[in-house]
């Protein structure tokens, strides 16, 4: 199902008439802190995070595009079982290291399977990137195949940056 979803996103992305305006980007996200303020379990013993925050170092690059900064992520909806299966919806603010007024603000929808995470992320640019949008996928390397969890919380990002579409044109 996930593969079909990503194939459909790719087809829509690359067959769009605005394809020439899109810049393919890639990069990395490394979590630097994770704080849970309040959580509870439901009748199925799944964990719900009412308030959790993650900070990360972000690097996104391509020919003609670059962004390096920090991410502040609020986990707005998190439902996880004891096997690492679940769903997380986040609100994100990415701030540039060189200019705090340059930001990307957006959200992500993530699926977890046995602790391995796949997300689709959408952002709107501010400051230097005013009028731009960014759409990314976030894929965690499968560390769930081994018993020892030595994942450094380093995630690969891939996607596009493009002009924000204008409705009615």
Where are these regions (language model features)?
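Sec-dependent N-terminal signal peptides
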Residues: 4-14
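Sec/Tat signal peptide C-region and signal peptidase I cleavage site
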Residues: 16-20
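Beta-strand-enriched cores of mature, soluble protein domains
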Residues: 21-169
């Amino acid at each position: 199902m996930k593969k079909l979803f990503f194939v459909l996103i790719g087809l829509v992305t690359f067959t769009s008439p605005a394809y020439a305006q899109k810049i393919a980007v890639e990069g990395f996200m490394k979590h630097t802190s994770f704080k849970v303020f309040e959580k509870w379990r439901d009748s199925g013993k799944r964990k719900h995070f009412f308030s959790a925050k993650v900070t990360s170092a972000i690097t996104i690059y391509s020919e003609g595009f670059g962004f390096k900064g920090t991410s502040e992520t609020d986990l707005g909806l998190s439902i996880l079982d004891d096997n690492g299966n679940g769903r997380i919806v986040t609100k994100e603010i990415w701030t540039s290291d060189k200019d705090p007024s340059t930001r990307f603000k957006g959200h992500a929808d993530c699926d977890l399977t046995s602790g391995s995470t796949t997300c689709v992320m959408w952002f709107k640019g501010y400051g230097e990137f005013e009028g731009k949008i960014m759409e990314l996928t976030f894929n965690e390397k499968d560390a769930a195949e081994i018993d020892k969890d030595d994942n450094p919380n380093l995630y690969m990002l891939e996607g596009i940056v493009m002009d924000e579409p204008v409705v009615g044109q």
